[in-house]
């Protein structure tokens, strides 16, 4: 293992063991000693509390006025139905909310596959049971699904909504996180002669709406973005000081004498009040040839000297002369 003794090993994604459709074990190694718990705890907290996802937030059931009631012909009471709806695993593409509808009649289970929805909505667990109908009865409901993150209890949303919310619109505790369970374990790892390293094993159970590897990647991105301010050691709200670019190339502000022209050429330019290189480059060949005592030989000399500095005659300079030179002219 090469490198400086002060360099930190960087972990890599070693293995993803898919236990079942919703559970996976992700192993990362090698890590410096102590970093297994440092990173494992940080990723665990982010995966549980900060991962975006979709959840049922509101339900309207025909014939039901409040959650502390029951519906004839339905085996479960309303509270149990709401609890079952919380287990619905849904994804929404291209928007932040969607309205789903469910209508079912006849004895038997009512499952997620019975829900009608748009093409931008995907129900990951179509076999999920919502309730059971008995006899020749029916049930109809409208289900609102929203995108969010974290856990938002119904009581918190009820306080922010208007008092004129229609009777029968039932609010549901929304758990937006697609991660249902997360645990991590730190084991010993070895790289060549070093045996004091950590291996981080993350055991994750999701609702099936996110791939375990993608969940790790998203949580790590969130953590990195939060640490950016510490890396820069400054307030991210402070405006960055932009370096002001000079209005003119500094060479244009230098006196004509710096061109080291012959005495004849220099005197001719001074007679025409051409004191700075910026004054000179704005003149054309025709204008200079009209200058007394300045012939073609002097003109050729001036053109060659300017060309050696990347300049030429006939240039246009906006806002010339600058204020710093205007006072001297």
UniProtKB/Swiss-Prot annotation:
Q: What class of enzyme is it?
A: transferase
Enumerate the Gene Ontology biological process terms.
DNA-templated transcription
What does the record give as the reaction this protein catalyses?
A: RNA(n) + a ribonucleoside 5'-triphosphate = RNA(n+1) + diphosphate
List the EC numbers from the record: 2.7.7.6
SUPFAM superfamilies recorded: C-terminal domain of RNA polymerase alpha subunit, Insert subdomain of RNA polymerase alpha subunit, RBP11-like subunits of RNA polymerase
Question: Which Gene Ontology terms of cellular component type are present?
Answer: cytoplasm; DNA-directed RNA polymerase complex
Recorded hits in Gene3D superfamilies, A to Z, give:
5' to 3' exonuclease, C-terminal subdomain, DNA-directed RNA polymerase, insert domain, RNA polymerase, RBP11-like subunit
Alpha N-terminal domain (alpha-NTD), as annotated region: 1-234
Which family does the UniProt entry place this protein in? Belongs to the RNA polymerase alpha chain family.
NCBIfam families per the UniProt record, alphabetical? PRK05182.1-2, PRK05182.2-5, rpoA
The name of this protein is DNA-directed RNA polymerase subunit alpha
The record lists the organism as Shewanella oneidensis (strain ATCC 700550 / JCM 31522 / CIP 106686 / LMG 19005 / NCIMB 14063 / MR-1)
